[in-house]
Amino acid sequence: MKKILLVLFLALGIISFSAPNFINISKIEKNGYEIGGDKENRLLIVKTLEKENTMENIYISYDFIEENPNVPNRKHQFFKETSPEGLEFTNSFETKRAIIGKYTEINNTYVYTFVSKKNKVKNCYVSVCYATDKNFQKNELEKVCNKFLDEGESYLK
């Protein structure tokens, strides 16, 4: 699982750090996230939660690109096309708020992607990659998706 998460992490981008002024970096760090990568057009924050014998990883990506209705679909497609070997795309569906993707690894690790379809801040698209051992059903995923997108958007000023 660590290799898969590392590849996802690298695929989302890593460089030096300088966040836009509409992102609250102190709040991000206060909530246990680390800056995982920063490019001119993307900021990635990362958090690992260890509970008993399990580990969960949360990656929140902020893409700074001109608004375009095709961006969420392209980001979802990017996740599908760049998923690491050993991580199988299971299915996806859309809600009013997001495109949700589900991936499964052989050892019962599940990776969920949540790509927001609407921007809270102009030209800033939020997406989340969540790795866990929990196999959520479709009816549960919308609630999980909203929780993580709400969290990601809470760091926007």
Predicted regions and their residues:
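Surface-exposed amphipathic alpha-helical segments
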Residues: V128-K157
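Sec-dependent N-terminal signal peptides
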Residues: I4-S16
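A short acidic-to-branched-hydrophobic micro-motif
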Residues: V46-H76, C124-V128
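Short, surface-exposed coil-to-beta transition loops
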Residues: E40-L44, T54-Y59, I106-F114, Y125
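Signature of long, low-cysteine stretches enriched in small and polar/charged residues
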Residues: E81-N119
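Long, charged/polar, surface-exposed segments that mediate recognition or autoinhibition
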Residues: R74-E85, L141-C145
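N-terminal "mature-domain start" segment
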Residues: F17-V46, C145-E153
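Generic recognition of long tandem-repeat/solenoid scaffolds
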Residues: R42-K51, I99-Y103
